[in-house]
Amino acid sequence: DILAAFRVTPQPGVPPEEAGAAVAAESSTGTWTTVWTDGLTSLDRYKGRCYGIEPVPGEEDQYIAYVAYPLDLFEEGSVTNMFTSIVGNVFGFKALRALRLEDLRIPPAYIKTFQGPPHGIQVERDKLNKYGRPLLGCTIKPKLGLSAKNYGRAVYECLRGGLDFTKDDENVNSQPFMRWRDRFLFCAEAINKAQAETGEIKGHYLNATAGTCEEMIKRAVFARGLGVPIVMHDYLTGGFTANTSLAHYCRDNGLLLHIHRAMHAVIDRQKNHGIHFRVLRKALRMSGGDHIHSGTVVGKLEGERDITLGFVDLLRDDFIEKDRSXGIYFTQDWVSLPGVIPVASGGIHVWHMPALTEIFGGDSVLQFGGGTLGHPWGNAPGAVANRVALEACVQARNEGRDLAVEGNEIIREASKWSPELAAACEVWKEIRFNFKAVDTLDPLKS
């Protein structure tokens, strides 16, 4: 069975047991009345079952309802069908004030019907010939308004300065100021030039997201013809069917696939209603993607440390034990489905490098947009500053130093022999994003 954990907030007067049973029925075989065609099938075989309810500590009138769904309810290899069944209609149920899907346990039998990520972590490392450290990226800014040639120039400067990747912003598709084909051509030229000068393999996340699946695949085909290593997709706005189609193309044609989570906070940010991002991540690993944006803990975007660490485990590891302290409701066995690299992006700069290296570890992408392009000396020096800071943190980690305790000292030491890093440290020394998180973990039962 697929197991689901729902956070249920019933309407006043509705018992939690009745609310849990209603969720199970409405998201499987049930309707609002008995119908004569019920007798033509075996409902016991197909109906969802609410097998447990527990109150949420510290919350009034909130409960976690556990529901089991028989596998025969779902089409093989279709995240679209899985979500249509489990969350497609029940969230508008009048008997509930609010409903949130907190977690799913996907059984190995169902996981085996999915291709998953086009390549996975180890294959990407081998393609790039880069090991033992996080990868460095940068989103080109301003995100909208640049011509294709100026955009390509910024890509070249960042890659030449020491970054591994640059990135299209999620809303860069094919607008009047910069059509996709022109952008792809100038970015490919920038990649080739930077590779020739540095001797390193470089990439730019060319956003293939489009209004139709056919147009999306056409853009991916063009990118492959240019010889670039990676393309990009906005998987929530583009949809799971489009994403799975692109992931299959990327595996068949040797392209890495970077995934942006644009629109996720509309779905996952409120604590009592929607779908938790850990569920959207599991769905992405099934649908297919080699990278996905994951918050930063320390940057400008929502994301508690323990919740984010739970996300990272679900993306990268083969087997994850149930751990309510990190928000993981079920033990998950991925049966060797390739892992996904988490991407830390959003309001980060060189002073964050030690914390990011410690939190995300080696198999990650640390992506500095404004933290590269906002350097007072230009794009290439901004890239140099980030590369020097990263190399210093990796060396300190390998020497056994505590990045959480000694992080600022490590950055100061490195800045003594890197004027680019020293300038970056001075510019961003006062930048903080100290806001209370909206989506937090529930207190554990005492």
UniProtKB/Swiss-Prot annotation:
One of the record's GO molecular function terms: ribulose-bisphosphate carboxylase activity
Alphabetized UniProt keyword annotations: Calvin cycle, Carbon dioxide fixation, Chloroplast, Disulfide bond, Lyase, Magnesium, Metal-binding, Monooxygenase, Oxidoreductase, Photorespiration, Photosynthesis, Plastid
Gene3D superfamilies associated with the record: Ribulose bisphosphate carboxylase, large subunit, C-terminal domain (3.20.20.110), RuBisCO large subunit, N-terminal domain (3.30.70.150)
Enzyme Commission numbers on file: 4.1.1.39
UniProt subcellular location: Plastid, Chloroplast
Post-translational modification N6-carboxylysine, affected residues: K167
Top class in the EC scheme: lyase
One Pfam family named in its UniProt record: RuBisCO_large
InterPro entries on file: RuBisCO, RuBisCo_large_chain_AS, RuBisCO_lsu_C, RuBisCO_lsu_C_sf, RuBisCO_lsu_fd_N, RuBisCO_lsu_N_sf, RuBisCO_lsuI
UniProt PTM: The disulfide bond which can form in the large chain dimeric partners within the hexadecamer appears to be associated with oxidative stress and protein turnover.
Binding site for Mg(2+): K167, D169, E170
Protein name as catalogued: Ribulose bisphosphate carboxylase large chain
Native species: Exacum affine
Lineage per the UniProt record: Eukaryota, Viridiplantae, Streptophyta, Embryophyta, Tracheophyta
